[in-house]
C-alpha cells in the first residue's frame, strides 16, 4: 500500500536535507518527494515497430512544475 501524503512530505524533506551533504538519487511516484528535488529526470518508455525503448531526460524548471502537477492529479 504505500505511505500517506504527510509521511511522503516528511520523507521528501529528510531527503532534501540529506542532499545538502551528499548525492541522493530517488525513484518515486510521490509528488511530495519529487517536488523537493533540485534536478528532476523523467523516465519514460517509447514503443517502436521493433521494441520498447526506455529513455531518461532532465526536466527544465517549468517542465518539473508541470510534471509535479500531473503527478498530483493521478
Features from the language model and the residues they span:
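C-terminal lobe/lid and adjacent interdomain/linker elements of RecA-like ASCE P-loop ATPase modules
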Residues: 6-74
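ABC ATPase nucleotide-binding domain "signature" loop
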Residues: 1-3
Amino acid at each position: 500500500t504505500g505511505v500517506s501524503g504527510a509521511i511522503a512530505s516528511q520523507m521528501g524533506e529528510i531527503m532534501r536535507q540529506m542532499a545538502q551533504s551528499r548525492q541522493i538519487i530517488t525513484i518515486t511516484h510521490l509528488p511530495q518527494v519529487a517536488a523537493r528535488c533540485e534536478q528532476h529526470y523523467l523516465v519514460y518508455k517509447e514503443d517502436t515497430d521493433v521494441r520498447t525503448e526506455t529513455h531518461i531526460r532532465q526536466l527544465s524548471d517549468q517542465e518539473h512544475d508541470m510534471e509535479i502537477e500531473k503527478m498530483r492529479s493521478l
